Amino acid sequence: MGCYQSRVQVEDKTNEQLDKYLVQAGKEGLLDFRILLLGAGESGKSTVVKQLKSIYKIQVDDDELHSYAVNIHKNTVLCMQVLLEAGETLGIELTDPETKKRAINVKSFQFEPEVKQMPVSIGLDIEELWRDEDIQKIWDRRSEYWFLDATPYYFENIQRFLDDDFVPTEEDCIMTRVRTTGISVTEFDEGPVHFRVVDVGGQRNERKKWIHCFDDVKALLFVVNLAGYDQVMFEDPSQNRMQESLTLFGQICNNPIFSETPTFLVLNKKDLFEQMIQKTDLSKCFPDYKGGSDVKTALEFIQMKYQQKIQESNKPLHTFHIAARYKKDIKYTWEEAKGILLEENKKVLMKATKDLKKSSKQSSKSSLGNSTQNNSNNNNNNNNSNNNNGQTTIDGATAKINS
């Protein structure tokens, strides 16, 4: 009985050592999963990051909340100024005298460095302008000029934004457009695995920085704005957003440095796409499309277009159709992608356990002898005889620790 009990204690100790080893291995980079988040400008990469932070309960501090509030106010004003400028370009005249006055007020307003909030008068002008029929005519032709996808959200929530005690909600933060400049890294742990999600600005002038992020990447997440098939770029109004995205995807996935890197294609803004496809045919972007307004057919066609950009025909492409503004979509996508990554890196996990067995074999034998002598002090461990059944599970990747 004493010998059996001692063996159980040694097994428990080995399992404990394994857990500590894997955690340490993660800290040292052995289980450091670096994931590169790429995509053209305004594809929704930053929204994906915000949702991951929420899922892993990474708190937004007061300074960040304040920054979000400031950007919400600035975005709201910018969106109406863009609409008014587009109306002039398109030759759509504002016929109502009151509307003209409000338009002049909004167009002439500028945020000064010390001004962090739009005045109530400007906010009310914007709210009334959004209701105007001529402004809606401009909005109906939004495929002809650059705009923010969240434009209606800002205008529909403007009363709340104007409140003196306004604090952005989680949805407000998700919907806030903050242009990514430089390189942003979001880190979180899951078990012994340390994830680093690297987000780099998607605008053309930011892409030269991407090369600095290409080393030691475990996976590529390429985010696409589905609604971009009927939108133009901020940097170049003559260029279609989706065509730009396709070109960029081809350049990235065919780079030799990523020949063995798992690639995930995230077709984002599905909610907007489902609305747009009913009004604007996909053939506007792809003349060879013949599927009409059927959402499923259109999504499969777009997915095929991206698949065709991969020169290695046998390279798998894992694809998701989502709306990143909804946490459940990101949670599902992340769980699926994470499972694939851990499965493909199972050899690393197994090597970690193999190294541990070698280093702990001698200490286990000596522990067995010492534990036998102290048998009478260890009666409370009898119920642990089947602990872990010789396995430890790391998010679906099972590592055996017994020969």
Swiss-Prot record:
Residues 34-47 are annotated as: G1 motif. Residues 374-389 have a biased composition (Low complexity). GO terms for molecular function: G protein-coupled chemorepellent receptor activity; G protein-coupled receptor binding; G-protein beta/gamma-subunit complex binding; GTP binding; GTPase activity; metal ion binding. Residues 353-403 are annotated as: Disordered. Residues 264-271 are annotated as: G4 motif. It comes from the Eukaryota. The keyword Lipoprotein applies. Residues 172-180 are annotated as: G2 motif. GO terms for cellular component: cytoplasm; heterotrimeric G-protein complex; plasma membrane. SMART domains: G_alpha. A lipid is attached at residue 3 (S-palmitoyl cysteine). SUPFAM superfamilies: P-loop containing nucleoside triphosphate hydrolases (SSF52540), Transducin (alpha subunit), insertion domain (SSF47895). GO terms for biological process: adenylate cyclase-modulating G protein-coupled receptor signaling pathway; G protein-coupled chemorepellent receptor signaling pathway; negative regulation of asexual reproduction; positive regulation of cell-cell adhesion; positive regulation of cell-substrate adhesion; positive regulation of sporulation; regulation of cell differentiation. Belongs to the G-alpha family. G proteins are composed of 3 units; alpha, beta and gamma. The alpha chain contains the guanine nucleotide binding site. This is Guanine nucleotide-binding protein alpha-8 subunit. It comes from Dictyostelium discoideum.
